[in-house]
A protein has these predicted regions:
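Charged- and aromatic-enriched interaction segments used to assemble
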Residues: 113-173
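Assembly/oligomerization scaffold segments
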Residues: 1-135
Length: 173
């Protein structure tokens, strides 16, 4: 069931890769979509941003666009906090303080003109990046239940700080 009241973005910021700049994106959000699936190992989101351009001061003191001013290239941290807007919804909070912020996986649909810019940020959880950059170089014992191997991979290789609930299995490999 859809909410009857619009969402309010308490926090929607992006931090440059060098950590020097943080930009509040709340005024430029056209749409925000959040995806969570029991069959997916990660949380993803998409946000469509529009800006009138020239909102960041660069090193020379000139005003430049968000895309060129941060610059947006991927890997930037995005913090989001959206309180629930109905009794059926839950708060969404992905912030550095909680250690579960999103990361920019890619920037698509980029349109930059003289006085405006539009782009889509494709966001992923930290586990998505770790999943792509980590290797498990171990053979797991065939005598142990699969659930034990899953727990070990998540905790020791993916280094997830999240509370992971793995159903116990009886079957070994």
């Amino acid at each position: 069931m859809a909410a009857k009241v619009r969402s309010v973005y308490e926090i929607f910021t992006i931090k440059s890769n060098d950590g020097a700049r943080t930009i509040d994106l709340r005024g430029g959000i056209v749409s925000f979509s959040y995806f969570e699936n029991v069959f997916s190992p990660m949380i993803t989101a998409q946000v469509l941003i529009t800006s009138t351009g020239n909102v960041i001061t660069d090193e020379d003191g000139d005003l430049v666009s968000i895309y060129n001013g941060l610059p947006l290239r991927g890997g930037e941290k995005v913090s989001i906090k959206i309180p629930s807007n109905s009794e059926n919804n839950v708060d969404l909070e992905f912030t550095e303080e909680k250690g579960n912020e999103f990361y920019v996986a890619s920037i698509t649909n980029v349109l930059i003109e003289a006085e405006k810019e539009i782009f889509t940020l494709n966001l992923v959880s930290r586990e998505a990046i770790t999943n792509e950059t980590s290797r498990v170089g171990k053979k797991f014992p065939s005598s142990e239940p699969i659930s034990d191997s899953v727990k070990e991979i998540i905790e020791k290789y993916l280094l997830s700080q999240k509370n992971v609930d793995v159903d116990e299995t009886q079957n070994p490999y």
